[in-house]
Amino acid sequence: MDEINRDIREKLPNVHRIFLDFSKLTDVQEQSIPVILSGKNALIISPTASGKTEAVISPICERMIEEFNGEFNSKKLLLVYIIPTKALVSDIYKRLKDKLSKLNITSASKTGDLNNFKINQPQNVLFTTPESCDSLLSRNPQIFKEIKFIVMDELHFLDNNYRGDQLRILVQRIARNANNPNELNYYAMSATIKKPHEMCKRYFKNYEIIISKGDRKIIFATIDAGKSFKKLEKIKNIFIEKKINRAVFFCNSRKKTTQITKQLKEIFRRDDGIFEHHSSINAEVRKNIEKRMAKTDKELSLCVATSSLEIGIDIGDIQVVVLIEPPLTISSLLQRIGRGNRTTDKTTCFGVFEIPGDKKVFTEMIDDARNGRIENIKYKSDISVAVQQILSLTFEK
């Protein structure tokens, strides 16, 4: 264990064995943990599967334990952890709840799919979406009086749209209801973006920017699928040759997802092991698909998805990512590629094109991704959020 690793672990005497075990700390953990322990706010930018969650939750828990001498009231909400999707809330909550429990820190989830948060006996940590947080804040603002930390995960997924503007106001409303708003700490996590300072200042002030680029190598190849993707048989041949049985296929629309799922079932001559995943599919069905993909057996597991699988739901170690069409942005490309080979230092990706023009787009986007060139998307506020938040405030007790 090197000196930096040892020094950081010594600063986390209560939690490092729970959250970080004995493996080497990742770059984002080495950079973030000292900043969070010092009490500073931070925006943490790092690739998928880099250990961002542990980089944030471990020092926060250490501070909670030290501040209350390990005997803090188990019926006070101290940390609200805001996450873009219900599926990711469920995934992170399941991953962390037992670890938090070992530290005598109570936790709960509140979404449209799962709500075990106790209004009269609030747990210490709440994992939720912006919408569910808004509902809770409107009906029970007193819950947030003891709040110490606000965490915003996958912020790039929310920023610069209706939900991001909703979150901006929610953060201010939470602070307004806190007994000690000036002592609140804010932590946001994001994928690579062009102008991190501009994004961060929309949500909180007095922050540090932590950037961990990661060093995963992108192995990329294009596949000509022909008109209407009639040559997808090539995919099957490559999978057999390379002994690939676990892959995620990304599409830009639900319609395309349904089309490709049907074609893959015809090509592989089977229905089992080939799944369709998007937000319109029943939540329980989605969860079962995610569980099946997370299994480590040798059975064929192919999942065709929209952006519903773009952010960090745990679906195990995917051997290859297949892009059925060029993503709309470089950021989206990086997120999708990041879903593959999460336990290694490389990620393998195929870009499937129907027309020669898409092949050129793929080549240019991959070159931009490898060289850190991210598009700058101009921020534009959504005025309709103001109307929604005014209505929400009228219900606030």
Q: For the regions a protein language model found, what residue spans apply to each?
A:
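Conserved Walker A/P-loop ATP-binding site and its immediately adjacent core
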Residues: 53-54, 76-98, 134-135, 191-196, ...
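Conserved SF1/SF2 helicase motif Ia
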Residues: 62-92, 177-183
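Conserved strand-helix element at the start of the C-terminal RecA-like helicase core
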Residues: 78-92, 187-188, 238-266, 276
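Conserved helicase ATPase core of P-loop NTP-dependent helicases/translocases
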Residues: 115-118, 275, 279-306
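SF2 helicase catalytic motif II
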Residues: 126, 130-134, 140-181
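Conserved interdomain linker/interface between the two RecA-like ATPase lobes of SF2 helicase motors
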Residues: 172, 184-257, 355-358, 379-381, ...
